[in-house]
Amino acid sequence: MAAFQKAAVNQLALKKKLNKMLAPYQRELNNQIFKDVKALRVGLDINKVNDTLRRLRKETKGPNDLKNLRDLNETAAGLSGMVATQRTVEIDSSLMSDEELIQCIENIDVIKKKAEYKGGSRPRISEFESETGMSKSDHEMFNKLFNRFAPKKDPGPAAFSTPKSWVGISPADLANQFGTSPAITICLIMMRTNSPFKQILDALHDISLLDQGMFVNASVVKAMTSQHPCLDCVEYTVPKNSSGYNITVKAVVKAANVLSKLPKVEKLVIDDDNRVEIIRTLLTIQRELNIKIQVNEERGLFEDIFYKICVSPNGPCVVSIRSELTGRGWENTIFRLRRPPPYAPRLYPDLMDLDLDALPPVKGDKKTEEESKIYIFKPAADEIDEYIRSPESASSDSEIPDPRVLYMANACEDLFKGGDSVFMDIEGTAQDPVEIALFNPDTGKFVHIFRMPKDKDGFKKASKHAHGLLLDDISDHPDLQTDKNIEAFFSKVPLSARIFCQGSDIEECLKFFGRKDLKPTDCKWKREEFMKYHENILDELSEVFPCKHSGTVKDKKGALTAPHCALLDCLMFSRTASGGKKTKDPTPATI
């Protein structure tokens, strides 16, 4: 326990020293962050974000899942101003002493080996090889001799093998695709909580203050949630491949620090003039604190900053989006050592080639300048429902007919053309549903209805633990309907209709909308019976799925989970009833 406390104190002392000594190279990035938030808020599709997160939660992922992530990263990079672009990085060795240059190269070499072992492109040296000093060929010969002459023991039970997370994917294609961006993090907090921008800034300000003197962890953020409700969307349990679209504690702290007025390493901005000075400062800190980078240890704060300074293109090296870069940092970077250190050709011949061609630029910056100020506007809610139901309109001489009443009645008739069997599901309570879906498996036609909740507190609670809907998701949805419109729809359901569902709440919902005569059939499936089709259906239909659930849904452990969706549930019920057979692709029922 004492050793753990000592290590934690050393890391905290290191963080304070890095923040302080690197302060001359830090810049205010707030204006650019705010511009990026504004652009992302408008251009980022929350449905694609949710689909990407769902794919990354899979135990086994393939090429289609990676393509989905890379496409989303490309969209985010196109909307952002702080994007790292591929270029040649030169380190002027004439400004460094021999000791500094040798230490710099050794650090990069160890970081490179560590990344290769972790990425699987190079096998990790076993503890046995390390202790005996054997080469790989010696170790193989030892194993042959040992198996031939040494007495054999009972192997015991077979060890549990963990399946590969990515199948059919080169580790090089995964590089630079999982970093976080403060602008994306802030944008997603706004989308998932519908919190005012000022409230989010207040929460991030408090986090940055705390992080100046301690390490802000999950327990700290949880404690702050009561004062800052916008932090309720933070994920405390994340999958192995968490991405820049997971609102993790680390991502929130990073966003808080880059907006802080205090000295923070997140605000580092490098260029050709200060890169070597920053490296020399880091090497001074390394000597003073006796820091040694180890291959068999997790990447620490020092080596993370050191690596980014040495191999990153000019600009904000800690918070820039790096998904536009290909390969590892040392592949994107060419070190032109203009004055080789002593014995460098013998120790590091791979770094001494001074005739390497520079990498061509991948993508130019085509973004136009925007206003320096940020204005985030919340769309005004459609007030037609309130106008139609207002006392003034009821007492007026001429009643304004709602065209959606006729539309919904015709949609119901279209739904039951070609078959009387439908699956039905709702989100919310039977007397206060916020989402209603019906799906006809014979024709593939569906009706998808949204409704504003009466019980706002109950809605917010269900949003966090079930459907993930926000009020904006409903109020801005083209399928938003009033009770009168929904009653018009159900009034056209034929008596011959066979409605299949899961749970007794569907019958109560039908009664609420005036159809006491309809008796739905409760299938009473176990959850695992229909949930096994969840991923396959979304993989097939994610591009055309009309549902939008922007909120954060977390399980009991605080891990992000898929939101419940009434239409998706209907499709799963249909797939279950057919024994797993694929039904017709869903299309909306229209006039």
Swiss-Prot record:
The keyword Ligase does not apply. One of its GO terms (biological process) is symbiont-mediated suppression of host cytoplasmic pattern recognition receptor signaling pathway via inhibition of IKBKE activity. A zinc finger (CHCC-type, atypical) spans 545-570. It is found in: Virion; Host cytoplasm. The keyword RNA-binding applies. Belongs to the arenaviridae nucleocapsid protein family. This is Nucleoprotein.
